[in-house]
């Protein structure tokens, strides 16, 4: 495939299409055709449905063939026109616009004849033959194998040259297309850079004017702002005076409000503190009561725990003491039996055996009876004590049993664990004691064996003694283990009974409490029901009374309404009558008053005119007297006002001068700062412009160098390819020429050797014949001395060369070889199997 996406398969100057590529394009065309008929041709759901349906119709798996969906998403992402136009652009881009110019025209023809006649479909064999034709060495070997005649060879060579020229033409066209695309890209880059340079030129040309205009506008704005600022100063002074007066009034109001707020805040703080103290006192009282109850409960619980621990320790100590006394008695008894048996054995064996049997029977019975008696007594004592303890424990802890039952369970488990460990320790200590005793006895028996091993009787007696002692020891072990197991089971059963009894007591207490609560709840519900019934009866009675009151009130209201209506009508008539009488009286009074008012006003007018005349005369006289004084006073006031105004103008000029100086200083500072910033901006802009120009120049230089490098590389590649082809042809020619020369030399040498051998053999035969004939003819030499020998040509070396049969063949071969060197190379290809040269 070329860079533009089209395949580089060329046949006779035109591009051809492979069947696989045609099938892929046909599938893509079908998908785009379905998308063009869809409502939304760019939705992912429609794209996926069209993709799956078309692939399944063509026998493909959508999960495996994902290349189509990638191409579709690329086309959707770059879609700007309709799918028909996009398909037309795609076919034009890959160079097959003449195959399918529309989505409705299929790529595959309908019948096989059209497929055979289609110039854009290539079969596999033709494609392979055309791909093989691109290789010169394979093409030469195929020509050598298939073409034999000289005319066919020349015709095929001409075809190959034309095919090669066409391939070169197609490659040159592709190169020109690539070059055109490259120039197009470079032109686009040049256009962008020219646009950037033009913009920079416009900026350089019009930027100073814009800056000058901007500065003029800023100066005008600044002067207008200064004038506006002076006006604002006068307005602000007046507003400041008003604000100061308003602030004084606000301050007074604020002080009053602050005083009230301070009083209210203090009062609220006092109330809050009092409430907090009150709540603290209540909480403290509740907390002290709760703490006293808690301490009382804790003291009771602690006493109960101490009593329980003391009882458990006393019980364990008594059991341990009983077990220890039993063990001590057993050990003493064993020692006593051993000592007595040993002494009796020394006295008499038979009596000793009988005594031992009797003693064993007696001891067993006595031991069993004593142990049973002691055990019964101890059990009775323990049962009495435990009954008393249980009664005391039930009396003291019955109320707190449900609360502390879980805690006690954990303590009981720990105690059981400790008891089990203690029992194990006791068993271990008993086992170690028994082991030590057994070791001592074994040592004694070993000593006795060493003493009495000389005689059989002593050995037999010792064996009997050992057997008796072992039986006795085994019985003792069984007794001890049975006793330990019995006491252990008794303790466990006692503990189980005790726990069961505690649980039953707790359960009965909880049950009684629960039943009591249920009874109380039922009684409370009954009381509440009776109370609700009483309240309902009371409300019903009140409601009836209120209904009766409402009826009485409605009757009274109707009576009052009728009376009020009668009274209202009477009052309206009375009011209307009184109004008429009053209006007549008022009209009379108004007439009288109006006449009096007119008379009074006329009299007052006459009086006022007289008074005014008098006052005017007096005023004229007074003004004449006071005019001089007023003129002097006005002059003095005007002069004072003029002086004050001049002073105010002086102060205003000074203040304006100060303001102007400050404004000028601020303006000069801002102007200098702005000037520095503008100079820095101009410098930065010039540097940036120069940098961009340098970057553009570097990029252009690199592009030109790259273009020259590419052109040089293409030229070098073309020259290298031509030189390689020429060198390959020359190398092949030299190989064929040298092989032909070597074959000719070998052939000539073979012929030469054969001829020389043949000539040498003939010469030997003739030499032998001549010698025989010479020996025969020596006798006759004297007779025929005058006659020359007819065998003088025996040693003539020119004789073999005179044979036309051989000389003609060698001469013809040499002439033929020279003629073949002048002919084209392909004539000798049928005699050779050349090794292709290493073109690398």
Swiss-Prot record:
Keyword Secreted applies: no
GO cellular component: cytosol; half bridge of mitotic spindle pole body; meiotic spindle pole body; mitotic spindle pole body; nucleus; spindle pole
Record has DNA-binding as a keyword: no
Main location: cytoplasm
Subcellular location: Cytoplasm; Nucleus; Cytoplasm, Cytoskeleton, Spindle pole
InterPro entries: Sfi1_dom (IPR013665)
GO biological process, one term: cell division
Domain of life: Eukaryota
Keywords from the named record: Cell cycle, Cell division, Cytoplasm, Cytoskeleton, Mitosis, Nucleus
One protein family per Pfam: Sfi1
Function per UniProt: Component of the spindle pole body (SPB) half-bridge involved in the initial steps of SPB duplication.
Sequence similarity: Belongs to the SFI1 family.
Protein name: Protein sfi1
Organism: Schizosaccharomyces pombe (strain 972 / ATCC 24843)
């Amino acid at each position: 495939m070329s860079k533009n996406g089209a395949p580089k398969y060329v046949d006779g100057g035109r591009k051809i299409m492979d069947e696989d590529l045609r099938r892929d394009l046909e599938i893509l065309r079908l998908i785009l055709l379905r998308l063009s008929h869809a409502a939304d041709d760019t939705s992912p759901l429609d794209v996926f449905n069209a993709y799956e349906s078309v692939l399944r119709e063509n026998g493909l798996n959508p999960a495996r063939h994902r290349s189509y969906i990638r191409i579709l998403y690329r086309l959707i992402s770059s879609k700007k026109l309709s799918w028909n136009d996009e398909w037309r652009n795609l076919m034009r881009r890959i160079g097959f616009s003449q195959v399918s110019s529309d989505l409705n025209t299929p790529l595959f023809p309908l019948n096989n004849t059209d497929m055979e006649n289609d110039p854009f479909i290539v079969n596999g064999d033709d494609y392979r033959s055309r791909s093989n034709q691109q290789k010169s060495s394979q093409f030469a070997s195929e020509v050598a194998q298939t073409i034999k005649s000289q005319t066919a060879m020349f015709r095929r060579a001409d075809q190959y040259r034309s095919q090669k020229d066409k391939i070169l033409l197609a490659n040159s066209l592709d190169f020109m297309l690539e070059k055109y695309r490259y120039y197009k890209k470079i032109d686009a880059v040049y256009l962008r850079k020219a646009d950037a340079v033009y913009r920079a030129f416009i900026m350089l040309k019009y930027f100073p004017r814009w800056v000058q205009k901007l500065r003029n506008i800023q100066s005008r704005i600044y002067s207008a702002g200064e004038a506006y600022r002076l006006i604002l100063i006068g307005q602000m002074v007046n507003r400041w005076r008003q604000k100061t007066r308003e602030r004084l009034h606000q301050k007074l109001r604020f002080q009053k409000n602050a005083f009230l707020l301070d009083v209210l805040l203090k009062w609220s703080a006092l109330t809050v503190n009092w409430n907090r103290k009150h709540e603290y006192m209540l909480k403290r009282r509740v907390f002290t009561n709760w703490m006293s109850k808690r301490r009382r409960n804790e003291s009771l619980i602690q006493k109960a725990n101490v009593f329980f621990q003391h009882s458990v320790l006393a019980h364990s100590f008594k059991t341990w003491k009983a077990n220890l006394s039993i063990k001590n008695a057993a050990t003493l008894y064993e020692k006593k039996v051993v000592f007595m048996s040993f002494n009796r054995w020394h006295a008499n064996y038979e009596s000793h055996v009988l005594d031992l049997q009797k003693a064993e029977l007696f001891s067993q019975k006595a031991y069993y009876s004593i142990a049973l008696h002691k055990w019964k007594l101890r059990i009775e004592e323990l049962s009495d004590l435990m009954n008393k303890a249980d009664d005391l424990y039930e009396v003291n802890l019955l109320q707190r049993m449900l609360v502390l039952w879980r805690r006690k369970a954990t303590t009981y488990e720990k105690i059981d664990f400790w008891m089990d460990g203690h029992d194990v320790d006791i068993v271990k200590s008993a086992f170690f004691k028994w082991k030590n005793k057994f070791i001592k006895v074994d040592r004694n028996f070993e000593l006795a064996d060493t003493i009495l091993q000389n005689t059989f009787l002593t050995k037999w007696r010792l064996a009997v003694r050992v057997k008796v002692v072992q039986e006795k020891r085994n019985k003792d072990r069984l007794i001890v283990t049975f006793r330990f197991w019995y006491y252990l089971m008794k303790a466990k059963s006692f503990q189980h009974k005790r726990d069961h009894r505690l649980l039953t007591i707790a359960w009965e207490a909880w049950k009684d409490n629960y039943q009591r609560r249920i009874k109380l709840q039922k009684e409370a519900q009954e009381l509440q029901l009776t109370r609700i019934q009483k309240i309902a009866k009371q409300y019903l009675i009140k409601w009836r009374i209120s209904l009766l009151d409402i009826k009485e009130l409605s009757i009274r209201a109707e009576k009052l309404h009728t009376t009020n209506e009668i009274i209202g009508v009477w009052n309206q008539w009375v009011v209307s009558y009184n109004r008429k009488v009053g209006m007549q009286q008022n009209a009379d009074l108004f007439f009288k008053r109006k006449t009096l008012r007119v008379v009074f006003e006329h009299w007052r007018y006459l009086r006022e005119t007289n008074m005014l005349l008098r006052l005017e005369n007096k005023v004229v006289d007074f003004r004449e007297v006071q005019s001089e004084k007023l003129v002097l006073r006005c002059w003095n006031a005007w002069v004072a006002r003029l002086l004050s105004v001049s002073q105010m103008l002086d102060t205003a000029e000074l203040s304006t001068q100060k303001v102007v100086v400050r404004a000028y200083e601020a303006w000069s500072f801002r102007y200098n700062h702005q000037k520095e910033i503008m100079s820095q901006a101009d410098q930065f802009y010039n540097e940036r412009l120069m940098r961009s120009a340098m970057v553009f120049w570097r990029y252009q230089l690199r592009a030109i160098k790259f273009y020259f490098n590419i052109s040089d590389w293409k030229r070098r590649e073309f020259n290298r390819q031509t030189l390689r082809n020429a060198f390959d042809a020359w190398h092949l020619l030299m190989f064929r020429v040298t092989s032909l020369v070597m074959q000719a030399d070998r052939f000539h040498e073979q012929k030469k050797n054969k001829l020389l051998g043949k000539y040498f053999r003939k010469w030997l035969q003739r030499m032998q014949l001549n010698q025989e004939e010479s020996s025969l003819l020596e006798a006759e030499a004297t007779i025929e001395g005058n006659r020359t020998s007819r065998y003088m040509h025996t040693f003539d070396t020119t004789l073999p060369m005179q044979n036309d049969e051989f000389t003609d063949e060698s001469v013809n071969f040499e002439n033929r070889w020279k003629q073949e060197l002048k002919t084209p190379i392909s004539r000798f290809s049928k005699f050779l199997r050349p090794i292709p040269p290493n073109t690398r």
